[in-house]
């Protein structure tokens, strides 16, 4: 592979990064944080049974969390869920 092709590939990847990076930053983010309240409930991959709360788009609802994995849309109490996710 010639130097011209390598430089062209580097230039292409650099432009692609500059164009797509702002979109990646703004998708599902609020105040610079990932908007975990928009994620679905996720039990995780383990088999434990912890009662947690998640935001379903309208309100906070209970779900059973397996104890590991999952995502950030899980809260130990309804109050914590509402504080983080409910819109005033």
From Swiss-Prot:
<keyword id="KW-0732">Signal</keyword>
<dbReference type="Pfam" id="PF00014">
    <property type="entry name" value="Kunitz_BPTI"/>
</dbReference>
<feature type="site" description="May bind Kv1.x/KCNA">
    <location>
        <position position="39"/>
    </location>
</feature>
<feature type="propeptide">
    <location>
        <begin position="28"/>
        <end position="33"/>
    </location>
</feature>
<comment type="function">
    <text>Serine protease inhibitor that inhibits trypsin (Ki=0.281 nM), kallikrein (Ki=337 nM), and chymotrypsin.</text>
</comment>
<feature type="site" description="Reactive bond for trypsin">
    <location>
        <begin position="47"/>
        <end position="48"/>
    </location>
</feature>
<dbReference type="InterPro" id="IPR002223">
    <property type="entry name" value="Kunitz_BPTI"/>
</dbReference>
<dbReference type="InterPro" id="IPR020901">
    <property type="entry name" value="Prtase_inh_Kunz-CS"/>
</dbReference>
<feature type="disulfide bond">
    <location>
        <begin position="60"/>
        <end position="81"/>
    </location>
</feature>
<keyword id="KW-0646">Protease inhibitor</keyword>
<dbReference type="GO" id="GO:0015459">
    <property type="term" value="F:potassium channel regulator activity"/>
</dbReference>
<feature type="signal peptide">
    <location>
        <begin position="1"/>
        <end position="27"/>
    </location>
</feature>
<dbReference type="InterPro" id="IPR050098">
    <property type="entry name" value="TFPI/VKTCI-like"/>
</dbReference>
<keyword id="KW-1015">Disulfide bond</keyword>
<protein>
    <recommendedName>
        <fullName>Kunitz-type kappaPI-theraphotoxin-Hs1c</fullName>
    </recommendedName>
</protein>
<comment type="similarity">
    <text>Belongs to the venom Kunitz-type family. 02 (native) subfamily.</text>
</comment>
<dbReference type="InterPro" id="IPR036880">
    <property type="entry name" value="Kunitz_BPTI_sf"/>
</dbReference>
<dbReference type="GO" id="GO:0005615">
    <property type="term" value="C:extracellular space"/>
</dbReference>
<feature type="disulfide bond">
    <location>
        <begin position="37"/>
        <end position="85"/>
    </location>
</feature>
<feature type="disulfide bond">
    <location>
        <begin position="46"/>
        <end position="68"/>
    </location>
</feature>
<keyword id="KW-0964">Secreted</keyword>
<feature type="domain" description="BPTI/Kunitz inhibitor">
    <location>
        <begin position="37"/>
        <end position="85"/>
    </location>
</feature>
<dbReference type="GO" id="GO:0004867">
    <property type="term" value="F:serine-type endopeptidase inhibitor activity"/>
</dbReference>
<dbReference type="GO" id="GO:0090729">
    <property type="term" value="F:toxin activity"/>
</dbReference>
<keyword id="KW-0722">Serine protease inhibitor</keyword>
<dbReference type="GO" id="GO:0044562">
    <property type="term" value="P:envenomation resulting in negative regulation of voltage-gated potassium channel activity in another organism"/>
</dbReference>
């Amino acid at each position: 592979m010639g130097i011209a092709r390598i430089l062209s590939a580097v230039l292409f990847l650099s432009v692609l990064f500059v164009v797509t990076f702002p979109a990646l930053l703004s998708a599902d983010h609020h105040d610079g944080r990932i908007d975990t309240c928009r994620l679905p409930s996720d039990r995780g991959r383990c088999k434990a049974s912890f009662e947690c709360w998640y935001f379903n788009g309208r309100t906070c609802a209970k779900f059973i969390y397996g104890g590991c994995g999952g995502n950030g849309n899980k809260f130990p109490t309804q109050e914590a869920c509402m504080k983080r996710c409910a819109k005033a």
